[in-house]
C-alpha cells in the first residue's frame, strides 16, 4: 500500500529533454490563480511530475521549497486517480508566496481534478477517432 502512494524517481520528470517535450507538445493546459499546469500524454508506465519554480517568480528559497513540497505531495496523492499516463509540469505564477498552504492545496486539488477530467475525456475520444 505504501508503494502505491510513494514518490519515487519513476514519477519525476528529470531530464531537460522531457521538460522540453512537455513545453513544446502540451496537450492540456490548466490555469489557476497562482499556478499553470502543462501536460501531455506519455508512453511512460507512470504519470510523472516536473516542477519549475523560477527565482524571478518566487524570490525566497524557503518559499520555492514550500511550493515544490506541496506540489509533490498533492501529485503523490492524486497520481493513482489519473485515467491515463501523463507528464505534468507545474509552474507557479507571481504572487504565490503570499497565499497560505490551505489555499495552495485547494488550487492544486482543483487543478488535478480538472486535469483528470481532461485526460479521461481525451482518452475516450482518441480510440473512436482511430477506427
Curated annotation (Swiss-Prot):
Annotated GO CC locations: ribonuclease P complex
This protein's UniProt keywords: Endonuclease, Hydrolase, Nuclease, RNA-binding, tRNA processing
Coiled coil: none
Protein's GO biological process: tRNA 5'-leader removal
E.C. designation(s): 3.1.26.5
One Pfam family linked to the record: Ribonuclease_P
Reaction equation(s) it catalyzes: Endonucleolytic cleavage of RNA, removing 5'-extranucleotides from tRNA precursor
GO molecular function: 3'-tRNA processing endoribonuclease activity; ribonuclease P activity; tRNA binding
Similarity annotation: Belongs to the RnpA family.
Subunit description: Consists of a catalytic RNA component (M1 or rnpB) and a protein subunit.
Function: RNaseP catalyzes the removal of the 5'-leader sequence from pre-tRNA to produce the mature 5'-terminus. It can also cleave other RNA substrates such as 4.5S RNA. The protein component plays an auxiliary but essential role in vivo by binding to the 5'-leader sequence and broadening the substrate specificity of the ribozyme.
NCBIfam families, alphabetized: rnpA
Protein name: Ribonuclease P protein component
Organism from which the protein derives: Acinetobacter baumannii (strain SDF)
Amino acid at each position: 500500500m505504501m508503494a502505491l502512494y510513494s514518490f519515487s524517481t519513476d514519477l519525476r520528470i528529470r531530464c531537460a529533454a522531457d521538460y522540453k517535450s512537455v513545453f513544446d507538445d502540451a496537450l492540456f493546459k490548466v490555469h489557476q490563480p497562482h499556478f499553470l499546469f502543462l501536460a501531455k500524454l506519455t508512453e511512460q508506465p507512470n504519470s510523472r511530475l516536473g516542477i519549475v519554480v523560477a527565482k524571478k517568480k518566487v524570490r525566497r528559497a524557503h518559499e520555492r521549497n514550500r511550493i515544490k513540497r506541496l506540489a509533490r505531495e498533492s501529485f503523490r496523492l492524486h497520481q493513482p486517480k489519473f485515467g491515463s499516463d501523463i507528464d505534468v509540469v507545474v509552474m507557479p505564477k507571481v504572487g504565490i508566496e503570499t497565499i497560505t498552504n490551505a489555499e495552495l492545496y485547494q488550487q492544486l486539488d482543483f487543478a488535478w481534478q480538472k486535469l483528470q477530467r481532461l485526460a479521461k475525456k481525451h482518452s475516450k475520444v482518441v480510440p473512436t477517432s482511430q477506427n
